[in-house]
């Protein structure tokens, strides 16, 4: 009896296309970035960072937090010195491969601008209507449904996660 593990970053390939190829005999396991606690453990810090007492410990945790929010929490990043190159490579692969090429998008400016505006608005709610208006203000003719589709492609590719407003 053999066990074969197939890994990849493309959510659609793993969930939709592989299903027919493997005849339904597969398990999808999503691996997410570290939580801050996991990140500290991976960087050889105390597990219970809330109990740090010394000024040095507080400074170390603050430094780790700054790294966490600046570079993210991919498990591989703990071992990589040039984090920006690694992250840019992931971005280019996901952006160009999983979003632009796979979905046959010709207006990549709109996708870049949507992603930029979402990143700039990370601390406050942002609606599809607002994103559409921002794009229109730059002279880009795009409909709300297209914006919704583009954000969906980004979500499918795990480039971003959305939170729904249920109020």
What does each model-identified segment do?
Residues 3-9, 30:
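Structural recognition of the conserved hydrophobic beta-strand(s) that form the central parallel beta-sheet
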Residues 7, 39, 69-72, 154:
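Conserved RecA-like P-loop NTPase ATPase core
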Residues 10-14, 33-37, 167:
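Conserved nucleotide-binding/hydrolysis micro-motifs of P-loop NTPases
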Residues 51-95:
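Amphipathic alpha-helical "lid/sensor" segments that cap RecA-like P-loop NTPase cores
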Residues 79-167:
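Accessory nucleic acid-recognition modules appended to NTPase machines
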Residues 31-53:
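Conserved small helical "lid"/interfacial subdomain of P-loop NTPases
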Residues 12-28, 40-45:
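Short regulatory helix/loop adjacent to the ATP-binding pocket of P-loop NTPases
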């Amino acid at each position: 009896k053999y066990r074969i593990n197939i890994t990849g970053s493309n959510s659609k390939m793993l969930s939709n296309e592989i299903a027919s190829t493997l005849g339904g005999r597969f398990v999808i396991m999503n691996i997410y970035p570290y939580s801050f606690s996991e990140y500290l453990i991976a960087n050889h810090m105390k597990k219970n960072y809330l109990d740090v007492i010394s000024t040095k410990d507080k400074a170390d945790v603050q430094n780790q937090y700054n790294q966490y929010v600046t570079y993210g929490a991919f498990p591989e990043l703990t071992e990589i010195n040039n984090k920006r190159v690694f992250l840019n490579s992931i971005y280019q692969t996901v952006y160009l491969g999983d979003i632009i090429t796979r979905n046959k998008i010709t207006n990549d400016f709109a996708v870049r601008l949507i992603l930029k505006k979402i990143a700039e608005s990370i601390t406050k709610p942002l609606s599809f209507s607002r994103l559409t208006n921002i794009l229109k203000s730059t002279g880009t003719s795009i409909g709300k449904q297209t914006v919704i589709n583009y954000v969906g492609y980004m979500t499918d590719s795990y480039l971003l996660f959305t939170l729904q407003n249920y109020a």
